[in-house]
Amino acid sequence: MIIDTHVHLFPDKIKEDRTLFFDGEPEFKLLYDSPRSPIAGADDLIATMDEQGVDISVVSGFPWRNPDLARQNNDIVIEAVLKYPGRIRGLACFDVSWAGAAKEAERCIDAGLSGVGELAFYLSGIDRTALESLVPVMEVLRNRGNLPCMIHTNEPLGHAYPGKTPVTLEQINELARTFPENRIILAHWGGGIFFYHIMKKQLKTDLKNIWYDTAASVFLYDSAVYDMADRAGVLDKVLFGTDYPLLKPDRYYADLDRSGLTREQKEMVLGKNAAVFYGN
């Protein structure tokens, strides 16, 4: 079984003319200003899943500043889950600084979504204000069966690119320490914080409820990142994610084949870990 845990879907009107939605949405413009940045709908996704051998995709929208846009995008995700039962699962997405974020999380969970994500703090990093804004949403997730929250992270070093935030490893660690009971997925390998699982003190405890997805891995890391996750003892917490439509799964399949993982370990990453995590 192959489960892609990191996929983005948008309403058709945004796919047709994204430029109409740049005003007042600096984060969206930052990531999608280039016409080469692909935008997809549910039918596009299913066609790609069938082509690439993906059984299930976990999809989300975008953390729009405009609450109406956030609701509309979440409605598209809900519709996709209902249209393709067993193939698509969904996460609610919004700007957590919005006063109605927790209620929107509840609405989406009631409608059948499986958690929250990909939440992002593209311009600020995960600072104290960001942590405080997460509190009501994290409480909702705990109260609803400890559903997961996926949060955008990135490596604090290296080349710049659209969507690279000023987040630090200290901030990522503080996120884990602030919400020790929540199940949190750190997108994009958690900015590399999983390497610190090899430390003898503190980090293993701090990161006990943290998972890591592989989204954009082929742009960021050598295939040895999978071997390092294995050596760090966190391979069972690695979730396959493509960031589709940014990348298709076959790029990741090839990357995994270049790693030193066994067939059984590759199967863990590609789907078994996510099946356990999401209860498939």
Locations of regions flagged by a protein language model:
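Active-site gating/metal-coordination segments in enzymes
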Residues: 55-56, 64-157, 161
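Active-site environment of divalent metal-dependent phosphoester hydrolases
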Residues: 10-13, 64-67, 96-100, 123-125, ...
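Short beta-strand segments
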Residues: 4, 58-61, 93, 185-188, ...
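Mid-to-C-terminal alpha-helical segments outside catalytic/metal-binding sites
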Residues: 1-8, 12-56, 106, 234-239, ...
